[in-house]
Amino acid sequence: MLVKAYSAAVNGLEVTTITVEVSLTRGVSYRLTGLGDEAVRESRDRIAAALLNTGLKFPVADITANLSPASLRKVGSGFDLPLAVAILAANGDIPSDRLGSYMLVGELSLDGSLQPVKGVLPIAIRARKDQMKGLIVPKANEHEAAVVNQLDVYGMSSITEVIRFLKGDDADFSPCVVDTRKEFYEQQYDFDLDFADVRGQESVKRALEVAAAGGHNLVMIGPPGSGKSMMAKRLPSILPPLTLSESLETTQIHSIAGKLSAGKGLISQRPFRSPHHTISQVALVGGGVDPMPGEISLAHNGVLFADELPEFNKHTLEVLRQPLEDRLITIARAKYTITYPASFMFVASMNPCPCGYYGDPTHVCVCSPGQIQRYMNKISGPLLDRIDIQCEITPVPFKDISKAQPGEPSSAIRERVIKARQRQELRYKDIPGVHCNAQMTERMIHQYAEPDEAGISLLRMAMERLNLSARAYNRILKVARTIADIEGSEQLQPLSGERPDRRLLEKEKAARPLHVVKQERRCGFRQVRMVVRRGYYLASAINSISTRAFFGSVFTAKAERAGKGAWKNSAYTSFISAKSAMSAMRTVVLTTSAIVRPSAARIALALLRLWRVSSLMPPSAKLPVAGSMGS
């Protein structure tokens, strides 16, 4: 006798309906065909033990079972239940007339109970597309599958309940009903962390707001204890809420990976994934013997946070380059190829040097220039080119923490972000696959973020002086477009520039002779200058762009070749009055001579004379005599 039952196989996000065919003839054997993996081949032993322990008998016959289509690879233990039901129906123990109306999936324990399986949500979507009357799943999976409307989902605890249901005794069974919209919307804004708890750090909040509004990638650089991780963990609270379609797509990925807890329905908040820096390439991007989604796919429509970025394996970081650009990941094997979506915001944090205190005014950095350079070289230029915004973060002094008022709540920031995203949704409504500024193509950048002549002039100067790549040029315009959307402007109009990052200024400082930079670094001397800057929206974007030079290649041979002219003629800086500058520098020299070797003061004075010669100070400025400061 030949009997057919129905189940489904999940490969990536694609689900294929599987016809389970069982034929019984005289004999004593069991054959399973259809390209199943080891778990599928072991199903015969689980089924036999489960039937025996529930008072049923495994048929003594020549059993041939086939999983069609036979050319498609089947993975997992979810075929236990449809195989067991088909075998019983072929033996005449249960009627087969209802098998064509229901799709079955579930793993059998040896005592006959049903265990949860992965990928039930996409299977439920497939069952509805196939116009099945219902879906029978393990009890632990019923809430997950019931979010699919117009499909009766029955959660069963054991195979005996399934047999009773298929025999027509369904008075004791009712489909699971979930109010999808109510459950989804009532949990959207239930956040445990809020930006109102953060005192100070307004510039970092601004950078996170711009990143959230445009979907831009971001990196935060600062010493230990400055609040990098704390700020990153609060980022989901200002992101725009998930739409139902985004939530369904995100929940499917987590269902396939087996990350949904029992009784969990739709994911209502954007995912926030924070893998440890020891993570492997396969765990990050996905794959394995039975390819599963990695962290980048689990962060789809959400945030992937890489804490202590340089501590990650360099080769592991390099595999992020293609997903960051294409927003999907393709896992290729000899016999099949699987594609998972990977549209996420990449947020990273890092220390500026191995000890963590380079540039910190309250601590002394003990790292040599070579150590700092090697530390920064762990992050490649192509990866940095894919990070739109960088932000320096410094610890908030205790007096500021104690006096500062509570910060702006996440709800207020989120409102501005939502308004900016709404403008972008309206702008790109006719363009499939593009929802925010970070997803713009090069053609769209020229259409929606083209600067005027003054803006082009500013960009040209930035490209030449900061040595930006073509990809960085496009990302400047994307960030500029986002800032304009936050301000409610359709055009990139003049605006007061935001405070440039100290490390952006270090790019200009890098143009000085190499030996001067090294001497300044050794004696701990800092230039004293006031930044006066006005520009366009894209001026703020230039300040935010991430490039190789941003991470301080101030000790490279390029700096020595460039000479001091580029730094001298910088359009971004102007020094304060000579009198104030000399007073501040003299104080630094005095302080330096007290904490370093005696020659430090002479080195600092030599630097002052060099700067006066380069016309950065008026010739009339008097320099202190080295002997007057002690030896």
Regions found by a protein language model. Give the residues of each.
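Basic, amphipathic alpha-helical bundle interface domains used for macromolecular binding and assembly
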Residues: 39-44, 59, 66-76, 290-291, ...
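Positively charged N-terminal leader segments that act as targeting/secretion signals
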Residues: 510-537, 560-566
